[in-house]
Amino acid sequence: MSITLGEKACRWGLCLGLVLWVGREGILCYAAADDAAVPSAEFSGSLVKTVKGRQYHAQVFAKGDRLRLEYKYAIRTERGYAAIEIIRLDKSETWYLLAQQKELLVTGLSQDDLFPIRPALPGERDRILVGDATAAGRATQLFEVQTDRHGRVERFYEWVDLDTGVVLKLVSRDREWSFEYERFRLSPQPAYYFEEPPGYNKRMATTGP
């Protein structure tokens, strides 16, 4: 199974134009590209997203404002297939590693490229604390959150890790959509996970992110 780059943001990424909210399939991907506080915790985890009974998986590695996603199924880009994506918020760029071509395909980071780290959701209008809960075996606070993106209202349950502020689980109350960490581990991440691989040529994408 492969996923085109154009579809990736909808299937694997929580497209914050909010294609995510439009109900397209994939792993939620909303890494804040703005200046709001991004949790500085370093961690790795296994993400699973369920859409209408179908599941999608990815491994995630985070180090401050740098993220690495290793997909179970490759993403088809304009230059070939990529199983690894690196999100560099500090550069406002997304990199796709094309192993066969030894190329690093670079796209700009748009507001539609988000990752499940911080609690604030795009278009958030209301947030109510429900109480204490658990997710991924960790203590969390459970919130009811309502968003409104371009007139589309959606309600969510959101589990936020008490220690790190990272979103560990997000469930839509209005459609068959959920995301959660099956595994979440706080641990130092090697810097090279988020750098340009040696021997790769950098190439700018001709299409948008």
Question: Which residue stretches match the model-derived regions?
Answer:
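N-terminal leader/targeting segments and the immediate start of mature chains
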Residues: S2, A9, G13-L67, P188, ...
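Residues that act as N-cap/strand-start positions at coil-to-secondary-structure junctions
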Residues: F43, K52-R54, R79-Y81, D126-R127, ...
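Extended, positively charged loop/linker patches that create polyanion-binding surfaces
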Residues: L114-P116, R125-G131, T140-Q146
